[in-house]
Design a protein with these regions (language model features):
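Bacterial N-terminal signal peptides that target proteins for export
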Residues: 1-11
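Bacterial N-terminal signal peptides
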Residues: 9-20
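C-terminal/domain-edge helix-coil "capping" segments
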Residues: 21-38, 105-107, 130, 140-203
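N-terminal segment of the mature soluble domain
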Residues: 37-39, 44, 49-116, 146, ...
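Short glycine/proline-enriched turns and hinge-like loops at secondary-structure junctions
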Residues: 53-55, 127-130
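Generic short beta-strand segments
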Residues: 116-121, 154
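Extracytoplasmic/secreted cell-surface and envelope-processing proteins
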Residues: 122-126
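Short, surface-exposed coil-to-beta transition loops
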Residues: 131-135
Length: 203
């Protein structure tokens, strides 16, 4: 190889190594992990806010955070919408406790997450407007619709504000992600043994 070509090849290899070191690539999930986890479907959120896009935006955030936690498989929102259309269910209010098993069976899910958007927008403070997000969530057992877990949280952009405005969140998307992580921090699926014991106690 000519000296000039050898130098050029070395530069290209070094450049590739530097790019690889600088880029952050999340590690792939362990082989077989996802297929062994229970499936959870997030139903369309009831939207009590004034923003028509709140449901879609928050659903994407919650599905993403749940996926990162690797405690369950999340059913894609598009699949949920398809089942709702096939069953002629207009919104989550149409999923009564009696219909939970049917919906879950169509989604091949062991658990359903239902919830309500209480707030999605901004509130006026002495220092100006800040984003505000509030959500309730309930985990429903696919067999009978019982509530196995629930949580509620309302936060604003200045909840963690410190001196000189440090820590204030001004982005609604950023605040939504913070809410989802906070709300799901203690999210755990009941173990099969606990679920079976509870079901037996209801007979």
């Amino acid at each position: 190889m000519r000296p000039r070509a050898r130098v050029l090849a070395s530069v290209l290899v070094l450049g590739g190594l530097l790019v690889g070191c600088g880029a952050h690539v999340p590690p792939p999930p362990p082989v077989g992990l996802a297929s062994g986890l229970p499936r959870v479907a997030l139903l369309p959120l009831e939207n009590l806010s004034t923003r028509n896009d709140a449901g879609d935006r928050l659903s994407r955030v919650f599905v993403g955070v749940l996926g990162e936690a690797r405690v369950c498989q999340t059913v894609q929102p598009g699949d949920v919408d398809q089942v709702f259309m096939e069953l002629r269910i207009r919104d989550a209010n149409g999923v009564t406790r009696e219909r939970v098993p049917e919906v879950a069976r169509r989604l091949d899910a062991q658990w359903l997450l239902a919830g309500t958007i209480l707030e999605y927008g901004s509130v006026r403070t002495a220092d100006g407007e800040v984003p505000s997000v509030g959500v309730t969530l309930r985990l429903l057992d696919a067999r009978d619709g019982r509530t196995a877990w629930s949580a509620m949280r309302v936060i604003t952009g200045d909840d963690h504000e410190g001196l000189f405005g440090m820590g204030r969140v001004r982005s609604l998307d950023q605040l939504s992600e913070r809410l989802a992580r906070t709300l799901l921090a203690d999210f755990r699926l009941p173990s099969p043994r606990d679920s079976t014991s509870t079901a037996g106690a209801r007979r």
